[in-house]
Amino acid sequence: LWREAPAATPFQSPAWLIPWSRHFGSEESFTLLARRAGRLVGAMPFFVWARDGRRTVFPLGIGISDYLDGSFAAGEEAACAAAMLAHLCRDPQRWQAVELQELRPDSALLAAPAPAGWSDRRAPQSLCPTVDLPGDLSGDLSDGLSGTDPLRRLPRRIRSNLRNCRNRAERLGRPWVETVSGANLDALLDGLFRLHGERWSTRGEPGMLADGSLRAFHREAAAGLLELGLLRLFALRLDDRMIAVLYGFAAKRRFYYYLGGFDPDLPQVSPGTLILGHALEAAAAEGMEAFDFLRGREPYKYHWGAVDRPTWLRQLRFGP
């Protein structure tokens, strides 16, 4: 069903949600399934948590998932969303609130009518800067680490900066990119955890991967995503030294940049810029239509020409 659902992202895939449930889930969880004439056309997992004196239903995956939604078959989105909201709100004795986070503007769950007797609040939640990648980006130029430069439509200053960074790296050694496989997955994740931590330690902060349960989750999720062909994990090396790692996903003509880490001792090489340039090149070469930087308004995202795309929060409560 996930593969047939046009709007479902990697954050709705079983490879992401099953590890999330195992590492962070509540004992009280359930999955709603929608069927038409016996055929499965919709699925969405939830859990229940008490907050502000109310038992509240949340989608599985909150906190570390940048987009939340159901997996709905094409043409069934509106019907599935309406049926699921009606089912969730049919018995206020079980729970008194439903909170749907990180919904994209075109989500059927954002548009579905609120059941009678439930208040309905909708508000902008996050911004996900995104670069559009036209389908004809692939080219025959030769500036990139990958051997082509499909980024010729990026701002001129970005392309110039990439060339300068590559030239500086080449004066120090041989820069090359290692792509994930089953054989090197653990080594690349080790590099990601180490470089991400080193980068944040320069700011006196632990970084989001300091927690052991998060690292364990990402190891399990990455293995499942790799098996499904959704994982995009790149390591930039200078000779044999790993100097940057980028962790992302690709599905349904969209690249999702989830997390990265780079060596803070090589500012003259700008390893973060180099690995991002490679990821954009790889996304364009695969025919992706968008490069999504996901949540957060860090200035570097806009240097690549990213434009904000919002997500929405919808809160349903029984009574006024």
Regions found by a protein language model. Name each.
Residues 62-67, 124-126, 296, 309:
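Short, solvent-exposed loop/turn segments at the edges of secondary structure
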Residues 76-88, 268-280:
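Conserved acetyl-CoA-binding loop-helix of GNAT-fold acetyltransferases
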Residues 284-318:
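Substrate-binding beta-hairpin/strand module that engages nucleic acids
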Residues 88, 92, 225, 283:
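Hydrophobic pocket-lining residues that define ligand/cofactor binding sites across diverse proteins
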Residues 93-103, 283-294:
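Conserved GNAT acetyl-CoA-binding A-motif
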Residues 1-61, 93, 102-128, 132, ...:
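A conserved beta-strand-loop-helix scaffold within acyl/acetyltransferase catalytic domains
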Residues 121-131, 308-319:
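Conserved catalytic-core motifs of GNAT/GCN5-like acyltransferases
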Residues 240, 272, 276-279, 283, ...:
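Hydrophobic, well-ordered secondary-structure elements that form the walls
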